[in-house]
Amino acid sequence: MNKEIFTSSLLDEQYTKYRHPSGLDIYIFPKKLTTFYAIFGVKFGAIDNCFSLKENPENIITVPDGVAHFLEHKLFANEDGSDSFERFSSLGADANAYTSFNNTAYLFSATENFYDSLRELIRFVTHPYFTEENIASEIGIIAEEINMYNDSPSDRCFYGMLEGMYEHHSIRRNICGTAKSIKKITPELMYNCYDSFYNLNNMGLFICGDVHEDEVIKIADELLPSKSTQFDIIHQSNNKKEEPQVFQTYIEARMQISKPIFNIGIKDTNIPDNSDERQKREAIYSILNEMIFSQAGELYSSLFERDLISPNLSYCYTISPTNAYNSIAGEADNPKSVLDEILKFIEDLKIKGLAYDDFIRSKRIMYADFVKSFDSTEGIANNLMSFSFDGAEILSYVDIIESITFDDVDTVFANAFDKDKITLSVIMPLDNN
């Protein structure tokens, strides 16, 4: 079994990566904290709705929206009629799962019985059980979940931003799918997706806590195959076929809210192929956002003091191999005026130039936030999965942050915030008339 140790003298942290004979990568991050945390992740998310197999690349398979999320729900069902949530609960562990655009994760946290809980995690994720009956019963449950998200102003506003930015990319579709799309899901389809994507070469096990590595590997040897099977997926989609400009510049809906909310999306099509370069771009944008949009900054003070925005203004840059965007979200009586004020501030700032002191302050904040994330087993395990699934190495991120210069940020800023790459998504209150 291949073993690789990663260390950081800056962070004084270390973890080990094992390449199990089954093809599964096992990451063990030792941490002497009271909580254990484990994630069994798979690189299968909501955007993976179109693919083919290497043995027949011309046969393109398209699956209904929401399949990855539906599969996540049903994997907890066992052939003996039990539910794995109940098994975790009996062990004193808190289990959960989630589906994102790019990945699916099955996880638990525990303060006791860690190894028994780990056995249950590996066992149920590697033993699917789908029937006509349990699929039919789940359709109604997920339809209610879809309705709940559709009734959420913040979710509607977020997806409106994505729909405005992207014309073709699967990210514009709801992770849960639609009430119509999930009705097309069958046991055969679920098994086909499971067999295609839930290959151990396409998965990872991420563990953080005060654990014994030998015991973890012993459990993996007990429950996993001794040989690897070939991973045959070829992604076939329109996810890279996007124009630089946004699809629509303005999206509006009306819902039962007291004050308008908004999401501003800035599309970024300059996506590096190299994972380290993607991580660096994410770090640069995070520093830039802190310089421009933080509560300590001139822009926020101006907007808030003139009552143009409510106190909470959030901002985030997101990047993956197939899409990237910057987003700013908040609450305002007139979101269009807020966007105009932001663009005017950006235009003036490009003439005046970024302040070096703001760069130093923002970089220190980002560095401190990253270091602080290593105080939590949950934060470590989730970040470990995120970095690893993107082909990056978590401990090297601190070196990436350290390496970023003022010129790096200034260069990105010079080409950011183009008007034709901006979408404004707004949820307005219902018209009283």
Predicted segment positions?
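Charge-rich, well-structured scaffold segments of protease-associated domains
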Residues: 74, 78-235, 275-280, 289-290, ...
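His/Glu-rich zincin catalytic helix
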Residues: 1-83, 191-302, 423-433
